[in-house]
């Protein structure tokens, strides 16, 4: 079977069952709440910590095995959260290492409910770190990027041109 055939078949089945993935803007409201450190808003989205977690139509089905499906969704979520938090000023190496730690912890879990509980823990951890960062840092994203570059190149000869963020790559 071809991918196109599979795609058309699945889209047809979803239309027949009247199911669809979570709306894009709703998904990013959630991710932006994490990145802005809004723990109150984020808590509204907590995962039910039971064996039905990740099984709703809005999540999509990544595997027929419920535990593997939960694991795949966890990895997708932590990858997106990591990148959005970096985009909003979290130090890159901290974010990626935190992501690695959570994925390694998830890899040892044996039930969907354990994965869901770790998912909630991971979301709270990233959200609180972003909240703390916003309170502590009065630096612009440009200064944060320069600090990150300098930290990563402590043993290299630093040049201003390499540190400077070009206007077209500027992040607001």
Residue ranges and their predicted role:
Residues 135-158:
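A short, Lys/Arg-enriched amphipathic alpha-helix from helix-turn-helix/homeodomain DNA-binding modules
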Residues 110, 130-136, 160:
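Short helix-to-loop capping/linker segments positioned immediately adjacent to catalytic or ligand/cofactor-binding
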Residues 1-129:
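Hydrophobic, helix-rich cores of sensory/ligand-binding and other regulatory modules
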Residues 98, 138-142, 166:
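Short, conserved alpha-helical segments within structured domains
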Residues 133, 153-172:
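Basic/polar phosphate-binding segments, predominantly the helix-turn-helix DNA-binding elements
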């Amino acid at each position: 079977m071809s991918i196109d055939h599979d795609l058309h078949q699945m889209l047809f089945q979803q239309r027949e069952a009247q199911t669809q993935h979570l709306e894009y803007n709703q998904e990013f409201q959630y991710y932006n709440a994490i990145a802005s450190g809004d723990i109150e808003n984020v808590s509204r989205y907590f995962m039910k910590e039971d064996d039905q977690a990740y099984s709703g139509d809005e999540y999509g089905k990544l595997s027929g095995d419920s535990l593997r499906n939960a694991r795949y969704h966890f990895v997708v979520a932590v990858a997106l959260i990591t990148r959005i938090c970096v985009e909003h000023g979290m130090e890159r190496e901290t974010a990626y290492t935190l992501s690695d730690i959570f994925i390694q912890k998830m890899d040892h879990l044996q039930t969907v409910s354990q994965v869901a509980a770790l998912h909630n823990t991971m979301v709270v951890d990233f959200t609180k770190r972003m909240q703390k960062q916003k309170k502590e840092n009065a630096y612009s994203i440009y200064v944060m990027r320069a600090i990150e570059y300098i930290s990563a190149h402590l043993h290299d000869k630093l040049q201003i041109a390499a540190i400077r963020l070009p206007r077209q790559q500027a992040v607001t």
